Each structure stands twice: as structure tokens, then as C-alpha cells.
């Protein structure tokens, strides 16, 4: 899919309401087009046990705490990637999306993570000093490398799947 195809508005685009956050049913028009192009393989990801249990709120407490610690560390790198993407586009829609996601990662998700982790007896010091797992480090190194060295389309391709996966989950309860 060419960059021009991603940014061009079509009659099938629906409005994006930033106040509702990024969800599978509330995506910016450019993201709707990218998501639709991936429909054939996308649903398989939601059937993976970890993602399914996370979404259902049935993930065992130890796994959930480990996930939250890793995700807490990840959010800072994810926000950096969006800042770099913001600097690489002139498109107001994409700029607003990058800024909204960056703000959400730093000011909303991190606060939720801190609250859950504190309820598990994990201190701020432990949260801030946790080492990323090898997998998490490989992933964040990859998206940061793309953000530093590639253009906005490559950055969007790198970050949108995470926004779609976690935006699509409704975590109603936590173990």
C-alpha cells in the first residue's frame, strides 16, 4: 500500500473521535484503511492464548504482573517512537494521532499500570528499575530503529498493530 493510498480520504472512512481513544471501532481514517488490508490474518492474533486471557481478564496474576512491568517499561519507548513519528509528518491527522497516543501512553496507561502494580506490592523503584525481557527489548529496539531511520509510513506500520491489538481488547477485570 502506497503512502498516497493511506492518507487519501475515501467515502468509506468514518470519523475518528480522539476523546474515545483508539479502539477497533474508533480508528483514524488512515488506520481504518490499513487495518482493513490486514483483515485476513488479523483475527488469528486474537485467538492466541495470552491475548485471549488478557482480554477476558483470566490471565493468571503472576503473568499479568510480569506483563504490566514489561509494558510499563515499553510505554516509554512507545511514546518516543510516536514523538519521532510526529516530527516526520506534515499531515495534521497523523500528527494528532501520534500526539494522542504519546499522551495516552505517558499520562494514562502508565498511571493505570502504576496503580495495578502498587496493588501487587511493587514499588515505584522496582517499576523504574525492572529489566526488559529479551523479547520486549528486541521489539522496542526494532520500533525505535524504524522511528529513527525510516519515514512516517514505516513508523505507522511498526506501531499501529500494537494500538489495534490493545485498543481492541476490553479488559473488564484483572486477576
List the predicted regions and their residue ranges.
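Short, charged, low-complexity loops and linkers
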Residues: 21-30, 55-65, 120, 145-150
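Active-site-proximal alpha-helical scaffolds that flank and shape metal-associated catalytic sites
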Residues: 93-175
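Short alpha-helical hairpin
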Residues: 9-18, 22, 35-60, 78
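Sequence termini and other peripheral, non-core segments
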Residues: 2-22, 135-142
Amino acid at each position: 500500500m502506497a503512502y498516497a493510498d493511506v492518507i487519501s480520504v475515501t467515502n468509506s472512512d468514518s470519523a475518528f473521535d480522539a476523546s474515545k481513544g483508539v479502539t477497533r471501532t474508533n480508528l483514524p481514517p488512515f488506520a481504518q484503511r490499513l487495518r482493513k488490508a490486514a483483515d485476513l490474518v488479523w483475527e488469528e492474533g486474537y485467538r492466541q492464548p495470552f491475548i485471549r486471557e488478557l482480554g477476558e481478564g483470566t490471565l493468571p496474576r503472576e503473568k499479568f504482573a510480569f506483563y504490566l512491568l514489561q509494558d510499563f517499561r515499553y510505554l516509554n519507548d512507545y511514546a518516543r517512537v510516536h514523538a519521532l513519528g510526529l516530527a516526520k509528518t506534515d499531515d495534521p491527522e497523523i500528527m494528532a494521532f501520534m500526539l494522542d497516543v504519546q499522551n495516552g501512553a505517558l499520562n494514562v496507561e502508565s498511571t493505570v499500570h502504576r496503580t495495578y502494580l502498587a496493588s501487587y506490592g511493587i514499588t515505584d523503584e522496582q517499576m523504574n528499575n525492572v529489566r526488559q525481557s529479551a523479547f520486549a527489548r528486541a521489539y522496542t529496539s526494532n520500533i525505535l530503529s524504524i522511528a529513527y531511520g525510516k519515514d512516517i509510513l514505516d513508523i505507522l506500520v511498526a506501531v499501529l498493530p500494537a494500538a489495534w491489538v490493545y485498543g481492541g481488547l476490553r479488559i473488564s477485570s484483572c486477576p
